[in-house]
Amino acid sequence: MTMESARSYDVLVLGGGNAALCAALTAREIGRSVLMLEWAPKHSRGGNSRHVRNLRCMHDAPADVLTDSYPEEEYWQDLLKVTGGQTSEELARMTIRATADCRGWMIRHGARFQPALGGTLHVSRTNAFFLGGGKALLNAYYRSAEALGVEIRYDCEVVDLAIDDGRFTSATVIEEGERREIRAKTVVAAAGGFESNLAWLKEAWGPVADNFLIRGTPYNMGRVLRVLIDRGAKSIGDPKQGHSVAIDARAPKFDGGICTRVDCVSLGIVVNADAQRFYDEGEDFWPKRYAIWGRLVAGQPDQIGYSIIDVKSMGRFMPPVFPPVKANSIPELAKALGLDPAALEATVSSFNRAVRPGNFDHTVLDDCGTEGLAPPKTHWARTIDTPPYFAYPLRPGITFTYLGVTVNAKAQVIMNDGKPAPNIFAAGEIMAGNVLGKGYLAGIGMSIGTTFGRIAGEQAARHAAH
């Protein structure tokens, strides 16, 4: 039996992370009644936003924590390159432009920024870092939402949406063990992708998905996404595409967060279970390439890789939470990793012979490359010959998936007939595939969530007023 809520709301926000909060705050600022539903318990609220560190920002001149400039066209070209053109230029440029002035709004709701830390992907020019990280940002937003009168319910799972001819009327939720119906004039879907749904990942990837680790929340099961698609929303994106990085293989199955990411890939070599290299570790700056390495490792035998460096590279990257495997020789390192010692020694020797002299500088695209080696290492190639040697085991770490719902510039969900749903809006991961067809840029997930959260909140509030 489904119990009907006695109250109807102007704006119903599904989700509890950055995009959901931006929508709820914006709608409430306009004066609409807002109910936000978070499936997670209060101590785990916030989705993947708990693990974020920064926001990628367009700016034409130095501004507080941002150095130099990062103009719109450069931002756009960076995005175009990593996505291979699989992006909506209209929505992407809208996102980029919105980042130029969103920080003032964020600060009004309690966000605090700090200069980039050493070793954080060389992004002090392009990214503004949150003081205290994502959890501090979320706590500030929740405080602001509560002060403004946003109603928030935790442990509340959305299991269905009533949508008739593209128009939303109510949501069915499970709360305190009971099915309840909640009515609202508008709805904002900001409940994340399906990255926590192991069965759905396996449906897309096959058996290899068994070896994937989920970097963030276990609550992003894709329930709202699935319901929207089943109710006629037009999908966008490939279910096999997403923000996927190489993380320490010793990380937990869920919620390891950013501290499990391995950032020394571009400083050394990466080998697979056969002790063979399989990709150019120095192709481009790490912020533009770190998010392809999860997918690369996923394509290797047993979905495992090993990032190998020598002592020369220590101290040049932000160390992950787990200590590296350490050895005084390459064969000894191979044994510790369970690799064939002769094979690893041959791979390292071959790499060392191919390294050409240059001026090593990890802050620029330097001239330290290899010659006659397949795959090559284009930049930052230095011989691995100074003990002790170190290694980090790698697994694919899924951050979020790109399969989502299609939206327009008003954040309205587009239905299969090509028409926008008049009162259904989407923000964050659930629609990020409109901007990210593949690839990733550090901090752009927060740019998308913040931009479309605010747009969705404003548009939902204005629709509810009529």
Regions found by a protein language model. Give the residues of each.
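Core beta-strand elements of the Rossmann-like FAD/NAD(P) dinucleotide-binding domain
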Residues: 6-9, 176-186, 420
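An anion/pyrophosphate-binding glycine-rich loop and adjacent beta-alpha core
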Residues: 221, 225-343
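Glycine-rich loop(s) and the adjacent beta-strand/alpha-helix scaffold that form part
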Residues: 178, 182-251, 446, 455
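Beta1/beta-strand and adjacent pyrophosphate-binding region of the FAD-binding site
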Residues: 5-19, 35
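A conserved short coil-to-beta-strand element within the FAD-binding core of flavoproteins
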Residues: 154-167
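A glycine-rich dinucleotide-binding beta-alpha-beta segment and adjacent secondary-structure elements
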Residues: 160, 343-434, 438
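Conserved N-terminal/central alpha/beta ligand/cofactor-binding core
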Residues: 33, 39-151, 268-277, 282-283, ...
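Helix-rich C-terminal "cap"/substrate-channel and partner-interaction subdomain
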Residues: 297-388, 459, 463
